[in-house]
Design a protein with these regions (language model features):
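A compositional/biophysical signature of low hydrophobicity enriched in polar/charged and small residues
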Residues: 3-371
């Protein structure tokens, strides 16, 4: 099934208009407390009804829906459906540090951002110019993507690819913490979970399941009618498939926010070392920290990658101190500070971190074909 990818150039003028219309909800470059509470509620249950969200945020369903529409239209927040950690762990995921010729980093990032297999693309300061998260169906497909696509992009001078052996935490588990305890309790809605005891084996994902997953990646709150049309199934079937995908953990919904608008100004990437016999203990300790958005073990040296959001640059050393206190046996080997996120889990972002488009995370396809 062919798709037209939405690019920043194609939609920029429309997004500017939407951003102007929605500008009243942002005060001095920050989201309001009501906006943050709404995003926080949807982080807990991204596909919850507006009635449930309204109870949690002490507003009306109409007001909650209208506020969310403004956030989405301005690119300040969005919901993405992504393969769950069990699916990523069954696939082949890698983290690539890229060095570029002077003046070429932006062009390389823009080229990679249009690729379905490049899930996230970040311009960084430190030992690398770019930090890229990629995924493919298997090691063979990943090898083709790295060797026959990434390595031949003009402007790249060096790459270091580290393959993930296990993902312990991802962005779907990160929380703003902007909702009251009472409100958070309201959002603990059941996930239609009879399927939870029966995880989906990767090879059992049908083509229609993948089409639904791809559509959820474009808009995690897509109506069932839209999901049904994308998968060419009935609406009732789409409902059952979504319940199965969510209940089994094959799909995780993640409510995202433009980081700086929420006060998280500094994304960082840390390379962490730990004794092999204490690797699992270490990553579990790291994954429990509230700043952490990603924690994975790697087939490489050092064997752990950590991504976190911080409020300011000076907080980096405090965060490292917190890491060492939580897990004394670790050593931070390297640090990258993200200068600009060009793409986050399929979503194209502008220089201010606002969503301006999306590329389907159709990682099952041949990485060298053009959509």
């Amino acid at each position: 099934m062919s798709r037209t990818l939405t690019t920043p150039v194609a939609i920029w003028s429309d997004l500017q208009i939407s951003a102007i219309m929605a500008s009243h909800m942002i005060d001095s470059g920050r989201l309001t407390e009501n906006d943050l509470a709404l995003v926080a509620a949807l982080q807990i249950a991204p596909r919850a009804s507006w009635a449930v969200v309204a109870r949690a945020t002490k507003t009306s369903p109409v007001t909650a829906a209208r506020r969310w529409r403004r956030l989405v239209d301005s690119g300040a927040a969005w919901v993405t459906g992504a393969p769950g950690m069990s699916v990523w762990n069954a696939h082949c995921v890698a983290y690539i540090d890229i060095r570029c010729s002077p003046g070429q980093s932006l062009a390389v990032a823009a080229a990679l951002a249009q690729d379905r297999h490049a899930l996230s693309v970040e311009l960084t300061a430190g030992g690398s110019d770019l930090f890229v998260t990629v995924a493919a169906a298997d090691l063979s497909a990943l090898s083709r993507y790295v060797l026959e696509r990434i390595d031949v992009i003009p402007g790249i001078t060096n790459t270091q690819t580290r393959i993930s052996t296990h993902l312990y935490r991802d962005g779907s588990q990160w929380r703003l913490g902007a909702l009251s305890h009472e409100g958070a309790s309201e959002m603990q809605v059941p996930l239609l979970s009879p399927e939870k005891a029966h995880p989906i084996v990767l090879s059992h994902l049908q083509v229609s399941d993948r089409e639904i997953l791809v559509q959820l990646g474009l808009d995690g709150r897509s109506p069932y009618a839209t999901l049904a049309a994308s998968a060419q199934v009935s609406e009732a079937t789409a409902r059952r498939r979504v319940a199965r995908l969510l209940g089994s953990g094959a799909v995780l919904m993640r409510t995202e926010v433009a980081a700086h608008l929420a006060g998280w100004q500094v994304p960082v990437v840390l390379s962490v070392d730990a004794p092999t016999n204490r690797l699992v203990e270490t990553v579990r300790g790291i994954a429990g920290l509230p700043q952490v958005r990603l924690c994975a073990t790697l087939a490489g040296t050092p064997p752990i990658v950590v991504q976190a959001w911080l409020h300011h640059v000076e907080a980096l050393h405090d965060f490292e101190t917190t890491l060492i206190k939580a897990v004394p046996n670790l050593t931070v080997v390297d640090r990258l500070i993200t200068l600009r996120t060009v793409k986050r889990m399929g979503r194209l972002l502008d220089e201010d971190g606002r969503a301006i488009g999306a590329v389907p995370m159709d990682v099952w396809t041949d990485p060298l074909t053009v959509a």
